[in-house]
């Protein structure tokens, strides 16, 4: 799960409280914070054009909405989905060490 970094101070305690209740009920679950992992969203009418420059060998125009693929972005292996929450076309790029995308 990726949470919005701007809400981390509220979301993490909320998840931890529900996790504790879940475990008390006899179910098995755990939570691990991975601060170096992250997600970058590229949204808007030029999203595919902007991202295409960073993914040689991949034809983003062939990637359908809500499709997902592992691909090399700017030299790093990433998990990319064609999705968005803005109402515009977009991509969400997940990486183990998000700083490598900058």
Give the ranges of each region predicted by the language model.
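Basic, glycine/lysine-rich polyanion-binding surfaces/domains
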Residues: 1-101
């Amino acid at each position: 799960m990726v949470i919005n970094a701007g809400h981390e101070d509220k979301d993490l305690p909320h998840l931890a409280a529900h996790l504790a209740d879940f475990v008390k009920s006899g179910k098995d679950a755990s939570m691990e914070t991975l601060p170096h992992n992250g997600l970058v969203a590229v949204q808007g009418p030029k999203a595919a054009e902007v991202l295409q420059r960073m993914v040689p060998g991949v034809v983003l125009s062939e990637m359908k909405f809500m499709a997902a693929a592992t691909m090399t972005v700017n030299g790093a292996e990433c998990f990319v989905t064609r999705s968005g929450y803005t109402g515009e076309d977009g991509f969400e790029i997940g990486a183990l060490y998000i700083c490598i995308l900058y």
